[in-house]
Amino acid sequence: MKGEIIYQIFPDRFNKSRQNNNVEGLKEWESEVDGQCVMGGDLIGIKEKLDYLSKLGVSAIYLNPIFQANSNHKYDTVNYYNIDSSFGTLDDFRELVDSCHKKNIKVIIDGVFNHTSPDFFAFKDILENQERSKYKDWYTIFSYPVKVESPPNYRNFGGCIDMPRLNTENVEVQKYIVDVIKYWEGMKIDGLRLDVPYYIEDSMLEKIRKCTSLYIVGEIWGCGKKFVPQYFDGVMNYSFRDLVQKAVIRQSIDASIFIDEWNFIEETYGQNIHCCFNMSGSHDTERIFNFCRGDIKREKLFYAFLFLFPGMPLVYYGDEIGMKGENDPYCRGTMEWNESKWNYDIYNHVKGLIELRNSNEALQKGTIQFVGHKEMMFAFERVYGEKRVKVFMNFGHSKQSIDGFELDGLSYKVIV
């Protein structure tokens, strides 16, 4: 998978279908969110908005976890073979995938295989049978009796008692997860995003890679050289996002340093750089509007980097209309469907970049070569076969020029 435009959806917060309108316990759709609330977004709601995504130019959606779980974020899996009832049914998911494919939209789902809920069948058996449980080696138990209380006496994720960590070195655990992946591959999904793979044993990652032909992207916050291409096709490229922040928002680096750091990222992933996500943000970060401090021109420039550099641009739901939100949980607010509240300056800019990208193979798949730089400005070419695009980017506050590069006589477009 390369050359796609990815749109990330947090299912509980994207769109609530009519059938969820009367569900008890839901907060009002536009009210402020917190870490515990359930807002009612569901799979049918996503299906209802596929025309919106098609019009925007999206070619793939990445869904945060949809498996049965207890929390609103669903990173605490209870059953890997069921859709969470708050989102719908397996039939609803099949219909969503089928509808996406009819609109040439691929579907990537979140695979949370490092940890589970305490209500996952294997951990429940440990709670019931303690040392006698045949699943006791599926987790790392420090002492008995095992209890779901603080401090936990079992290995867990992030100190959370509700997320016991699987022993991913265990061959039975590995076989179970491989079977889960094959099951969802049979549901015609196109890709898998692996949550916190840096905690998963290499032997399990190897089995995951060998068991499927699905596109695999890993959640990697730093250097992913260990993982790509051995285990993953690409990563969520937080390193590139951080680099663009340093240049465009903090302005703490010049063009020379930017180029050096980009070259390191590109060398890390090689050709697989085209399979990595260039992200505006995610469910784990503050929204782009917030870290740009409401500076629309800077936000537009940030988007230009994401769309003009190698990699697959990822738009986090709502960023394209100027939604606001600090870090989790506030970056997970409900999608604003009242168009009178949209920031059309941002929306039209993002839509225009998507159209530019989708109409130019050099931007989708081409190599990149820097051809000049000066202070806070650089120029580069994207080349794919006979197709070429030359890009000039100025992230400073004043007009600049690069000796030997003129636009006179050339067809060009000012993006920001």
Where does each model-flagged region fall?
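Loop/helix patches that line or flank the sugar-binding groove of alpha-linked glycan CAZymes
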Residues: 1-3, 17-39, 243, 259-400, ...
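Active-site-proximal helices and loops of the catalytic beta/alpha 8
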Residues: 97-103, 115, 127, 179-182, ...
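Aromatic- and acidic-residue-enriched segments that line the glycan-binding/catalytic groove
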Residues: 2, 18, 23-26, 72-84, ...
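The substrate-binding groove and active-site-proximal loops of carbohydrate-active enzymes
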Residues: 31-44, 76-90, 159-174, 189-199, ...
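Hydrophobic faces of well-ordered beta-strands that scaffold small-molecule active sites
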Residues: 5-7, 61-63, 107-109, 192, ...
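N-terminal structural segment of carbohydrate-active enzymes
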Residues: 1-106, 114-116, 121-125, 175
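Active-site-adjacent "subsite" loops/lids of carbohydrate-active enzymes
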Residues: 121-189, 197-198
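Conserved, mostly hydrophobic/aromatic
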Residues: 9, 53, 63, 80, ...
